[in-house]
């Protein structure tokens, strides 16, 4: 989501200098750095610029391949209500209350302290679980449009904590400023290299409540944080402002761990969707 602008007074003082910086590793004709934090979600229905949607679609593909553990009418329902699901995935980044008045605080969750980056704000674990449960209530009431919209919201928050920066409260204003957004732009260019091609989701991975799953995903993601954000990648990112060589270096450095994260996210998401159906029953 390339428009996640922090509405904090402290952030406002940083926006002006950031806007004047262009990086050697830009692929869009020198567009400026923006204050953003997300897996990308630029278009409701286009995977190329919406890694949240890409992860969910790959998770549904995993479910479709597993005809032993996954009831295929569940896959059929996901496809039947795909528009509502995608609307929920997208709305999390573009509509209130989901994007928290442009602070996006609820899209972050550090599993070590249970908090987001803004004190006392709601975080991704409680927010994702909230919409998981609201989706289930709507499903039981046979309000399918609302059910799958809420499910899309919940999947967005789960997707966020699968990204190590979100699980470590590393925002786009963290040093080096702009690294968060440039990293996620880069992820969009390599994600198709890391499609899961089997039917092995993380079935029954955690307990029976969504909080455990979101927390567990954040724990694993944070363990991988140093493979993406470390002294080398930060130094190279800063130097990439004037050097394509260093842009290539930080990208190469983060690629292996990014691939691991993308594959884990697909499998966790498949299991999480299965948990939702297991919890609230089939239509």
From Swiss-Prot:
Signal peptide: 1-24
Swiss-Prot/TrEMBL keywords: Cytolysis, Hemolysis, Hydrolase, Metal-binding, Signal, Zinc, Zymogen
Family to which this protein belongs: Belongs to the bacterial zinc-metallophospholipase C family.
Residue ranges of every copy of the Zn-dependent PLC domain listed in the record: 39-283
Positions contributing to Zn(2+) 2 binding: 166, 180, 184
Subunit structure: Monomer.
The protein's name in its UniProt record: Phospholipase C
């Amino acid at each position: 989501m390339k428009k996640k602008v922090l509405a904090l007074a402290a952030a406002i003082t940083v926006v002006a200098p950031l806007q004047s910086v262009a990086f050697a590793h830009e692929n869009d004709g020198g567009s400026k750095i923006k204050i953003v934090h997300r897996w990308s979600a630029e278009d409701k229905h286009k995977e190329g610029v919406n890694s949240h949607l890409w992860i969910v679609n790959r998770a549904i593909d995993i479910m479709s391949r597993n005809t032993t553990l996954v009831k295929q009418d569940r896959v059929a329902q996901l496809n039947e209500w795909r528009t509502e699901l995608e609307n929920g995935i997208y709305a999390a980044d573009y509509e209130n209350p989901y994007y928290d008045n442009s602070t996006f605080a609820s899209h972050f969750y550090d599993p070590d302290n249970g908090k987001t980056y803004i004190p006392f704000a709601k975080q991704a674990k409680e927010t994702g679980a909230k919409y998981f449960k609201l989706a289930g209530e709507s499903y039981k009431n046979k309000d399918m449009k609302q059910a799958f919209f809420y499910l899309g919201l919940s999947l967005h928050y789960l997707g966020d904590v699968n990204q190590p920066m979100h699980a470590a409260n590393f925002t786009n204003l963290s040093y080096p400023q702009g690294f968060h957004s440039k990293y996620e732009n880069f992820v969009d260019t390599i994600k198709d290299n890391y499609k899961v091609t089997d039917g092995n989701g993380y079935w029954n991975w955690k307990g029976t409540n969504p909080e455990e799953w979101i927390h567990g995903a954040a724990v694993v993601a944070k363990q991988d944080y140093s493979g993406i954000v470390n002294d080398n990648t930060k130094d190279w990112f800063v130097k990439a402002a004037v050097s394509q060589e260093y842009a290539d270096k930080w990208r190469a450095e983060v690629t292996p761990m990014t691939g691991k994260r993308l594959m884990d996210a697909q499998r966790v998401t498949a299991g999480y969707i299965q948990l939702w159906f297991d919890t609230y029953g089939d239509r």
